[in-house]
Structure formats: structure tokens, C-alpha cells
Amino acid sequence: VLFPLPWQNEKHPTDPRGRTNGEVMREILLWRSKFVLPPTTLGPLLQMSACLTHHVSSKDLKRINDLVPKIAIITGDWDQIVNPSHSKHMHKMMPDALYEVWKDAGHAIHIQFPFTFNKFLRQWIGLPPVHD
């Protein structure tokens, strides 16, 4: 759900064992799960409810556009969590925001393309690039 299947099947660029992106991501997510408390019964239900009922009106989006000095709306063209058309609508209501659609990207752009995302973010907030 978070990552496009073709990307999951590609060889991970830095994995010394030559595994795919999907294999590396599964290992990372399993490792991270060891450090979080198991959810309560109510937790996942409330999260689903929040996702299903969350709404920000066009009026509120315009107000955010007017009050927040710097906004970036970044979406993947393959986002299965937030339909890219919703991000496009957000930009329509917040025309001062930077708007980018990343090709072949899912919902977790910062995980799928960490180096590209960090480079973008550093440039966008005015920090110098990090040299390898």
C-alpha cells in the first residue's frame, strides 16, 4: 500500500546483500515494530475513523494558505493512501504552496526516496546540500 510494486521489486541501491527494495523495507518495518508498544483495541479503530472522517474545508485551506508562510504539497503519482487528486485540490485552494507530483512514488516518499527527499527538503528550507 505504501510503495509501488515495481519499486518494491527493484534491487535496493545500497543493500550489500543485493536484496530488493521490498525485502529491505520489510526488514526495516519489522525491526521498528520491536520498539513500539502494541496497539490497544481502540487505537486502530480510532485511526481508521480519523482517516475516514478527516476533512479540511476549502475555506480553511485558503486560510492556511494566507497564514502559513511556506507550504509544500508533495505527493506520489501512485499514492494509495491519499489520492493525488486531493493533493491537487489542496494546491488549488493554496496557490502559494509549492506543489510537486513525484513519478512512480507512493505515499511514503520520504522512505522510498530518502536521498532525493532530503535534498529537496534541505534546498526548500534553505540549508546547504550535504556532500557524500
Segments (PLM) and residue ranges:
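Hydrophobic, aromatic-rich cap/lid helix
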Residues: 33-60
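Short beta-strand/loop motif that positions the catalytic acidic residue
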Residues: 67, 73-75, 79
